[in-house]
UniProtKB/Swiss-Prot annotation:
Cofactor: Mg(2+)
Cellular compartment(s): Cytoplasm; Secreted; Cell surface
Subunit architecture: Component of the RNA degradosome, a multiprotein complex involved in RNA processing and mRNA degradation.
Disulphide-bonded residues: none
UniProt function note: Catalyzes the reversible conversion of 2-phosphoglycerate (2-PG) into phosphoenolpyruvate (PEP). It is essential for the degradation of carbohydrates via glycolysis.
Protein name (Swiss-Prot/TrEMBL): Enolase
Co-factor note (free text): Binds a second Mg(2+) ion via substrate during catalysis.
Main location: cytoplasm
Catalytic reaction equation(s): (2R)-2-phosphoglycerate = phosphoenolpyruvate + H2O
Length: 436
């Protein structure tokens, strides 16, 4: 038995200068797990609640002392003495103790930090790397794959202080044979994009996720700049590198008139018109994945978009599904989208996260493991991506240590598996729904 002997919570700082929750779980034998909760900027309305103090005299109201107190008191008292290797039991104890549908009593930030720290401590007690332990929890022990990165190299929307409406323009180094090669390709395109933007007199300041945040005349301009950067780096767009977008459509959807209002371009679209706007972009550029291409509440619009684009484009639900199996189940039944974005803190525990990944895979949907715009040095999502063989990861651009921490952990994992004589496959374009 890997007995929990101590649980510690503390307030630390994330990549946006806001507080977040970090937890330590200590076991008999001296094993310790340490984990921190991330935080989103564009959030789905049905996400589990991130508990903030609301005290304007401290961190502008964004302190997390209440969530930390829950870790140090109620949660600690409930799980000390329990077996850390019973992950589902530990998570359920916290969920039941919280007693709310959206974890608003303790906060998903408190529960998640403890959930992940517990898994890390349990893995250490078994002498396993975290990715291997996650595979065991997932019922897929020994089954790994390296994820295809979706690298956000131009930031807009809520992730940047610019006029670009679409939140993320991403590259996928699909021509790579290994994760390490994919990162090299991504880095080379990133640096060439800086040169392209500078040559046009544009800003090379970066947004929350490490991508550039220039003011551009249109979303098509962003894609054109990336195309030029890919070619300058010596790669072929559509063969070596493909494109992906996160529209974060809920951020520019006007619920009063039902229109998608792209103020950066001075255009407004109905739901169906916006789908056809995106369809035109996919004809001009090799865009193989579109995330949140409609507002989270516009299920009719999503159904239409899936009908129009779903046979050839991966349509990822983020704000749409919020890593929630109840919502995902409904989406699967109604034929909404064909992929889910997986964010730990949208649901608030490792066990529930694994359940969402399994449900998606069982239904033929893909699962894209994702960071949040507010991150820390915690690299757990790298282990999650490998340990569930999810196939894809979204963890930012080729700058900012909070993003690079995840890529570096993936490098370590890939190397460790190679040294052990059990290399994990890198799936390339096959990982993307509709591209196999």
């Amino acid at each position: 038995m890997a007995k929990i002997v101590k649980v510690i919570g503390r307030e630390i700082i994330d990549s946006r200068g806001n507080p977040t929750v970090e937890a330590e779980v200590h076991l008999e034998g001296g094993f310790v797990g340490l984990a921190a909760a991330p935080s989103g900027a564009s959030t789905g309305s049905r996400e589990a609640l991130e508990l903030r103090d609301g005290d304007k005299s401290r961190f502008l109201g964004k302190g997390v002392l209440k969530a930390v107190a829950a870790v140090n008191n109620e949660i600690a008292q409930a799980i000390v003495g329990k077996d850390a290797t019973n992950q589902a039991e530990i998570d359920q104890i916290m969920i039941d103790l919280d007693g709310t549908e959206n974890k608003s009593n303790f906060g998903a930030n408190a529960i998640l930090a403890v959930s992940l720290a517990n898994a890390k401590a349990a893995a250490a007690s078994k002498g396993l790397p975290l990715y291997a332990y996650i595979a065991e929890l997932n019922g897929t022990a020994g089954v790994y794959s390296m994820p295809l990165p979706m690298m956000n190299i131009i930031n807009g929307g809520e992730h940047a202080d610019n006029n670009v409406d679409i939140q993320e323009f991403m590259i996928q180094p699909v021509g790579a044979k290994t994760l390490r090669e994919a990162l090299r390709i991504g880095a080379e395109v990133f640096h060439n994009l800086a040169k392209v933007l500078k040559s046009k007199g544009m800003s090379t300041a970066v947004g929350d996720e490490g991508g550039f945040a220039p003011n551009l005349a249109s979303n098509a301009d962003a894609l054109a700049c990336i195309k030029e950067a890919v070619e300058k780096a010596g790669y072929v767009l559509g063969k070596d590198v493909t494109l992906a977008m996160d529209c974060a459509s809920s951020e520019f959807y006007n619920k009063e008139n039902g229109m998608y209002e792209m103020k950066g371009e001075g255009k407004s679209f109905t739901s169906q018109e916006f789908t056809h706007y995106l369809e035109e972009l996919t004809k001009q550029y090799p865009i193989v994945s579109i995330e949140d291409g409609q507002d989270e509440s516009d299920w009719e619009g999503f159904a239409y978009q899936t009908k129009v684009l779903g046979d050839r484009v991966q349509l990822v639900g983020d704000d749409l599904f919020v890593t929630n199996t109840k919502i995902l189940k409904e989406g699967i039944e109604k034929g909404i989208a064909n992929s889910i974005l997986i964010k730990f803190n949208q649901i608030g525990s490792l066990t529930e996260t694994l359940a969402a990944i399994k449900m998606a895979k069982d239904a033929g949907y893909t699962a894209v493991i994702s960071h949040r715009s507010g991150e820390t040095e915690d690299a757990t999502i790298a282990d999650l991506a490998v340990g569930t063989a999810a196939g894809q990861i979204k963890t930012g651009s080729m700058s900012r240590s909070d993003r690079i921490a995840k890529y570096n952990q993936l490098i370590r994992i890939e190397e460790a598996l190679e040294r052990a004589g059990t290399p994990a496959a890198f799936p390339g374009l096959k990982a993307v729904k509709g591209q196999a």
